[in-house]
Amino acid sequence: MMKVIPLGERLLIKPIKEEKKTEGGIVLPDSAKEKPMKAEVVAVGKIDDEEKFDIKVGDKVIYSKYAGTEIKIDDEDYIIIDVNDILAKIEE
């Protein structure tokens, strides 16, 4: 994979795609699905206050629906997003 390092207080995240089915069992195409808002953190830029913002590579997060810039790396979808658009960290 090409290495992408976010600049400033930004993250590189990979959306977690969940297969969406109707109640009747029909799998919906990507164009009919809502944009995913869960992602895995792939790279972290320079965070000014790391104690306040405890996000690291591998964490799963929920982000603002229309935030960030979508990019493709090796035919995979990623988003470069500002840390302020991260709404929550998912702990499993």
Swiss-Prot record:
One of its GO terms (molecular function) is protein folding chaperone. Keywords: Chaperone, Cytoplasm. Disulfide bonds: none annotated. SUPFAM superfamilies: GroES-like (SSF50129). GO terms for cellular component: cytoplasm. Heptamer of 7 subunits arranged in a ring. Interacts with the chaperonin GroEL. Its main location: cytoplasm. The keyword Phosphoprotein does not apply. NCBIfam families: PRK00364.2-2, PRK14533.1. This is Co-chaperonin GroES. The keyword Chaperone applies. Belongs to the GroES chaperonin family. Pfam families: Cpn10. It is found in: Cytoplasm. Gene3D superfamilies: GroES chaperonin (2.30.33.40). It comes from Thermotoga petrophila (strain ATCC BAA-488 / DSM 13995 / JCM 10881 / RKU-1). InterPro entries: Chaperonin_GroES, Chaperonin_GroES_sf, Chaprnonin_Cpn10_CS, GroES-like_sf.
